[in-house]
Regions:
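Accessory "access/gating" subregions that flank catalytic or transport cores
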Residues: 205-342, 450-458
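Hydrophobic alpha-helical bundle architecture
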Residues: 311, 322, 328-401, 413-422
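C-terminal regulatory domains involved in ligand/effector binding and gene-expression control
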Residues: 76-256
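Extended hydrophobic packing segments that form well-structured cores
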Residues: 422-458
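Alpha-helical support elements that line or immediately flank enzyme active sites
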Residues: 18-35, 298-310, 355-363
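Short, mixed-charge aromatic SLiMs
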Residues: 45-58, 90-97, 246, 319-333, ...
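Conserved phosphate/anionic-ligand binding catalytic regions in large, soluble enzymes, centered on
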Residues: 9-27, 281-300, 341-352
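Short alpha-helical scaffolding segments that buttress acidic/His motifs in well-ordered protein cores
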Residues: 8, 12, 268-276, 319-327, ...
Length: 458
C-alpha cells in the first residue's frame, strides 16, 4: 500500500486525531454516501454508536462534537475552530442537524448518539452510523474504524491489510527500514530524497514542497497561538495553560538565559507545550502523526530553525519527508493508535520520527538516522495511554515536551557514533507492536488504568 507524506501530516482539529479527526471524517463520509446514493432527502433520522475506546473516552476527546460537525458536512482541515462552540450550542439548543448543510432533520443527542464501552471486533475505535426514512426503515448503515492519526477505514477494509485505498506504484517502494535503507545505499540517496521521489507519483515536486511548507506554517501558527492564549483548558480538570507565561519569561531576558547551557531546552519545552495546549483546547493542529503527540515534531523543528546555524526551508522539507518515511514504517508494521498499542504508538512514534528527521538535517548518515529513530522508540517502549478524565491534557501535554527533548538527545547520541547499533529500527518497531498487543486494555486510551484512576478529578 502506498502512503504519502500528506497521509502522515494532516491539518486537523484538536484534541485527538483518532477520537476527533477520525470520527468527523467518518461522519462526513457517511452523509456524503447518503447524498451519492440519492438517500439524503429521504433521511429523517440518523443514529450513531461509538464503541470501545471511543465510547470510553469519547466525551473527553470531543468525539460527540466531531460527529455532529461531520454530519453537518464539516471537515477537520477546514472547519472554523472559532465557531465550533456556537455551532454545537445551536445544534443542541434547536435539536436539529443540517446534514451536509442542506437537509435538516431532528436530532436528540441522548437518543441518537450512544457511547458503548464494548469494542467492535476489528479495532478499539469503532463506529456505526445508521440512517432511517420517515417510515422508520433503515436506508443505510456503515461501520467505520478510526485507526489512528486521523486514518479511517470502513467495514469493507476492516481486517484487511489495506490502510488507504491507494495502490499507486512508487519508484522506491519500501515495507521495512531495511528496504528503505537499501534504496538509500544502492542509489546514494538520503531518506528524504527517496521520499521526495516517491511523492512525485502523486504530484510535481514543487507542489510537494509547497504543501510541506504549508504544513510547517500551520505548525508555526499553532505554536504562536499557544504562546499567546491563556486561561483554563476545557473539560473539568481545571488545567491552567502554561505556555504563554513561559514564553514571557523566556523573552524577558533571552541573553542572560542563554548563559545556562540547558536553556535551549526551555524553548523546546515551550514549543511542545504551546502546541498541545492548543490541541487540548480544540484548536487547529497538524497530526504528527497523531494529535496526542502533535507537539513533538513542531517542537523539534522549531529547535532546528531557531538554534541550528544554516537552517532553512529546504531543511524543513527534508525534515518532514524523513519524519514521514519513518512514520510510514510504524503505520504499516505496527500502529500509531494509543487505543491499540498505548502511548508508545503516539508519543513514542513521534519521538522516533523527530529524532530521525533531525539527524538527517544535521548531516547524519542514513545509518545514523536509523539509529536516532530506533533510540527514540526504544526508550518509549511500554508507554501507556492513561489520560485523566479521558482528556488529552494530563499526562499528554507534558509528555510531548519530554518526548521532544528525548528526540534531540537521541540525535546527539546517534551523531556521536558511527551508525552501527545493536537494535535495528525494524526490530524495535516489531517489539513495539508486540508490547502493545500484550498491554492490558485499561492502559490503552480507556481511562480505566494508570494515572486515570489514581488521580482524583477535582
Amino acid at each position: 500500500m502506498s502512503l504519502s507524506v500528506f497521509d502522515l501530516f494532516k491539518i486537523g482539529i484538536g484534541p485527538s486525531s483518532s477520537h476527533t479527526v477520525g470520527p468527523m471524517r467518518a461522519a462526513v463520509r457517511f452523509v456524503e454516501g447518503l447524498r451519492r446514493e440519492g438517500l439524503l432527502t429521504a433521511t429523517t433520522c440518523v443514529k450513531v454508536e461509538l464503541y470501545g475506546s471511543l465510547g470510553a473516552t469519547g466525551k473527553g476527546h470531543g468525539s460527540d462534537k466531531a460527529v455532529l460537525l461531520g454530519l453537518e458536512g464539516e471537515h477537520p482541515d477546514t472547519v472554523d475552530t472559532e465557531t465550533v462552540a456556537a455551532r454545537l450550542q445551536e445544534i443542541r439548543g434547536n435539536g436539529r442537524l443540517n446534514l451536509l448543510g442542506e437537509h435538516s432533520i431532528a436530532f436528540n443527542e441522548k437518543e441518537h448518539l450512544a457511547m458503548i464501552r464494548k469494542p467492535l471486533p476489528y479495532h478499539p475505535n469503532g463506529m456505526i452510523f445508521r440512517a432511517f426514512d420517515a417510515a422508520g426503515l433503515q436506508v443505510r448503515s456503515r461501520e467505520y474504524y478510526s485507526v489512528g492519526g486521523g486514518f479511517v477505514v470502513d467495514e469493507d477494509a476492516a481486517g484487511a491489510d489495506r490502510i488507504v485505498e491507494d495502490a499507486t506504484p512508487l519508484t522506491f517502494p519500501f515495507k521495512s527500514a531495511k528496504d528503505l535503507l537499501g534504496h538509500c545505499v544502492k542509489y546514494g540517496l538520503s531518506i528524504s530524497q527517496v521520499m521526495l521521489t516517491n511523492e512525485s507519483a502523486w504530484r510535481p515536486e514543487a507542489e510537494t514542497r509547497a504543501g510541506l511548507l504549508k504544513i510547517w506554517q500551520v505548525m508555526q501558527d499553532c505554536v504562536a497561538a499557544g504562546c499567546r492564549n491563556e486561561g483554563i483548558l476545557p473539560g473539568g480538570l481545571k488545567v491552567k495553560r502554561r505556555a504563554a507565561a513561559l514564553h514571557r519569561q523566556l523573552c524577558k531576558n533571552p541573553e542572560s538565559s542563554l548563559r545556562d547551557p540547558l536553556s535551549v531546552l526551555d524553548w523546546v519545552n515551550l514549543y511542545a507545550l504551546a502546541v498541545n495546549e492548543e490541541n487540548a483546547n480544540g484548536g487547529r493542529v497538524v497530526t504528527a502523526p497523531t494529535n496526542g503527540a502533535a507537539g513533538i515534531i513542531p517542537a523539534v523543528l522549531h529547535y532546528y530553525m531557531r538554534f541550528i546555524p544554516g537552517s532553512n526551508d529546504d531543511g524543513v522539507v527534508r525534515f518532514l519527508l524523513t519524519a514521514a518515511a519513518i512514520g510510514i514504517l510504524y503505520k504499516e508494521n505496527a500502529s500509531i493508535s494509543g487505543a491499540e498499542v498505548g502511548c508508545q504508538g503516539e508519543v513514542g512514534v513521534a519521538c522516533s520520527m523527530a529524532a530521525g528527521a533531525l539527524c538527517e538535517v544535521l548531516g547524519g548518515t542514513v545509518q545514523q538516522v536509523e539509529n536516532a529513530a530506533e533510540i527514540g522508540m526504544e526508550h518509549n517502549l511500554g508507554l501507556t495511554c492513561d489520560p485523566i478524565g479521558g482528556l488529552v491534557q494530563v499526562p499528554c501535554i507534558e509528555r510531548n515536551a519530554m518526548g521532544s527533548v528525548k528526540a534531540i538527545n537521541a540525535v546527539r547520541m546517534a551523531l556521536r557514533g558511527d551508525g552501527q547499533h545493536f537494535v535495528s529500527l525494524d526490530k524495535v518497531i516489531r517489539t513495539m507492536r508486540q508490547t502493545g498487543a500484550d498491554m492490558k486494555s485499561k492502559y490503552k486510551e480507556t481511562a480505566r488504568g494508570g494515572l486515570a484512576v489514581n488521580i482524583i478529578e477535582c
